[in-house]
UniProtKB/Swiss-Prot annotation:
Tree of life domain: Bacteria
Organism: Acidovorax ebreus (strain TPSY) (Diaphorobacter sp. (strain TPSY))
UniProt EC number: 2.4.2.7
Gene: apt
Protein name: Adenine phosphoribosyltransferase
Biological process annotations from GO: adenine salvage; AMP salvage; purine ribonucleoside salvage
Amino acid sequence: MTALSVNDYLRQHIRTVPDWPAPGVQFRDITPLLQNPKVFRVLIDAFVHRYMDRALRPDVVAGLDARGFILGAVVAYELNVGFVPIRKKGKLPFTTVEETYELEYGSATVELHADAVQPGDRVLLIDDLIATGGTMMAGKKLLEKLGATVMEGAAIVDLPELGGSARLRASGLPLYTLVDFSGH
């Protein structure tokens, strides 16, 4: 499959749920990508093939709560590197570092175990979707607090009209996404 056909193939398996969780929202549901083993393999392989390259190979994969865990753990396994979860506040049992970020109405906090990465580790930060970019930016800051370098952010879906991918790139974070839903 070519890169273009992989993107189109994956797009065909992303369900759009209108007016969820609120009127006017077009929710991009990735669960159909996970339900079919052939489609799931194509999805995971799209990430693994990119990061097998020596220049892009991470030391660690970090996944953002919660769908980033699904992708990140499998990609880390396939690359034979460690996986670390970045969780919502209060979900990790050991000493943590935390980062608070702004939401449209309020704020949220994510945490990482203080020993999850080592200074100098090259980290791939992965999630299912980039909307406003707040969660991924908070994850990047957490990893950098511990001395790691976030070499790239990755996601299945980019919603560029919400500005997150532009903000992340402007912060210096390279991004790799598989399906762009601009103008949809």
